Curated annotation (Swiss-Prot):
Zn(2+) binds at residues 178-179, 182, 194. Component of a multi-subunit COQ enzyme complex, composed of at least COQ3, COQ4, COQ5, COQ6, COQ7 and COQ9. It catalyses: a 4-hydroxy-3-methoxy-5-(all-trans-polyprenyl)benzoate + H(+) = a 2-methoxy-6-(all-trans-polyprenyl)phenol + CO2. Pathway: Cofactor biosynthesis; ubiquinone biosynthesis. HAMAP family: Coq4 (MF_03111). Its main location: mitochondrion. This is Ubiquinone biosynthesis protein COQ4, mitochondrial.
Length: 297
């Protein structure tokens, strides 16, 4: 959730990036105009020119490259632009998504995810029900994490620029399960913790966007926080992420009632160095309990 923090970058970079802000709409208009040119009978894209799924925006290689560069500048200039961060992830995914899909196919649990294609949002997850799960279960831990961080499961951008519907779902699944990674790794939502998780995700999944974010993001930290990131969090992230189970293969929704400690042991995950939380755990648990009691009555 790097997008929740404000970038501290020179005004010149922000100004240079402004023309890229409307790239998706510009590219869509370009495609429509190009297709209407007289004598234009063959497609402008080598694979497909019609949407393959709802929300799909087909791009040819040139458009993909332009959007990748533009979204990189916009993401750096204003990390709050979640649409640009998402576009960067999609346009730079390359061969990583087929590799992640293959990992899922090699896993019984991952194959069920691909077959059933569950979605993660407040319409598909009964947060009130999870709040009634016993203490120590993943479902209860997830609700407490949401309360502690002040976030919801409804903030993820839909996929637009990946042609293959199955690979588009793999990207969407990664995006929507990102908060589960925060929860299982016991990391809050702040810049240094998000960067630590990006290093973890790169070691675990190999998505190029996670490495780009991990390399560029530290410029927004104070020298003290940057020193701690590289001295404590990055070694944990690379070692733990690289040796643990590939989290893209986990069917999280089937594990609400499982003990979190048992899940960590199964996945090969251990806690990172102690992170800085904006809300104490006791306060978050009390708030979650009040919410649960209110729903009961």
């Amino acid at each position: 959730m790097l997008s929740s923090a404000r970038a501290r970058l020179p005004i010149s970079l922000c100004s240079f990036s402004l023309p890229f802000a409307r790239l998706p709409n510009t590219l869509s208009r370009y495609q429509e105009t190009w297709q209407r040119l007289p004598g234009r009978t063959h497609p402008t894209r080598s694979i497909r020119t019609t949407p393959a799924y709802e929300g799909h925006i087909p791009l040819n290689w040139f458009e993909n490259a332009v959007l990748a560069v533009g979204s990189a500048f916009m993401s750096l200039a204003d990390p709050r632009r979640g649409d640009m961060v998402a576009a960067l992830g999609e346009t730079t995914a390359g061969p990583t998504l087929p590799s992640l899909r293959d990992r899922m196919l090699d896993s019984i649990e991952g194959r069920r995810v691909l077959m059933q294609r569950p979605r993660v949002n407040s319409s598909t997850i009964d947060l009130n029900k999870l709040a009634h799960y016993p203490e120590g279960t993943f479902g209860r831990a997830y609700v407490t994490w949401l309360e502690r961080c002040g976030v919801t499961p409804d903030t993820r951008e839909p996929v637009h620029y990946i042609d293959d519907p199955e690979l588009a779902y793999v990207m969407q699944r990664y995006r929507e399960c990102h908060d589960f990674y925060h929860c299982i790794c016991n990391l809050p939502v702040n810049v240094e913790s998000e960067l630590a998780l990006k290093y973890f995700e790169f070691a675990n999944l190999g998505l190029p966007m996670t490495l780009l974010s991990a390399l560029v993001g530290p410029v927004r930290l104070t020298p003290q926080k940057r020193q701690r990131l590289f001295a404590e969090f990055v070694p944990w992230a690379l070692k733990c992420g690289g040796s643990s189970r590939s989290l893209i293969t986990v069917y999280w929704e089937e594990r609400w009632g499982q003990n979190v400690a048992d899940m960590k042991t199964e996945f090969g995950i251990w806690d990172p160095p102690e992170a800085r939380w904006s809300k104490p755990l006791s306060e978050a648990k009390a708030a979650a309990e009040r919410h649960r009691t209110a729903q009961t009555h």
